[in-house]
């Protein structure tokens, strides 16, 4: 018979990322996102989350296909944003590109969010990240789901899961510099794990 496939994504869902921004900046509503053309599915997922948020977030998106266009995209984005987000795409994976976004945010007094602990250590405000232990546990559970779903009919569509629950990391120094008093990491992590 056909074997069902389970796919575990390395990063938390965009809805979790947005929930974190919402929890840290409850009064703000404009989120600036720099994306690469390849990250369009992530942008679409974030747009859905932004529309479903209550109240909705106003997503400002600039596409930067390469390092040269990054500076131009940031210049256009910063004045229209209350916060910036680095997606787990080619920009988020590139240290130089991430630092460009962090510098632009710092220069304008905007908090920067992302999906990696490295971003927070380098001057980002907060990130919803997946930890290796939590990914391993989720992979085991996904394996059990795949095994038990083997007997049912729709075995040809893969089971795809975003990393969950996300763990929140905050840079307290950056928060103080921005005059923000976000909740504790543990409280934010619990808040993201709660059903919305």
List each model region and its residues.
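Short hydrophobic alpha-helices and adjacent helix-cap/hinge residues
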Residues: 1-196
């Amino acid at each position: 018979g056909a074997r069902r496939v389970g796919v575990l994504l390395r990063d938390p869902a965009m809805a979790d990322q947005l929930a974190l921004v919402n929890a840290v900046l409850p009064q703000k509503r404009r989120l600036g996102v720099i994306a690469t053309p390849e990250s369009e599915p992530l942008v679409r997922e974030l747009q859905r989350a932004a529309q479903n948020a209550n109240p909705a977030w106003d997503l400002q998106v600039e596409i930067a296909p390469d390092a040269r266009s990054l500076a131009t995209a940031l210049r256009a984005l910063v004045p229209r944003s209350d916060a910036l987000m680095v997606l787990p795409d080619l920009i988020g994976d590139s240290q130089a590109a991430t630092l460009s976004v962090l510098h632009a945010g710092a220069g304008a007094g905007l908090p920067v969010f992302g999906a990696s602990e490295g971003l927070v250590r380098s001057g980002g405000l907060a990130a919803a990240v997946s930890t290796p232990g939590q990914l391993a546990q989720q992979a085991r559970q996904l394996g059990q789901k795949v095994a038990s779903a083997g007997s049912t009919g729709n075995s040809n569509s893969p089971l795809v899961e975003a990393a969950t629950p996300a763990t929140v990391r905050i840079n307290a120094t950056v928060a103080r510099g921005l005059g923000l008093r976000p909740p504790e990491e543990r409280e934010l992590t619990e808040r993201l794990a709660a059903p919305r």
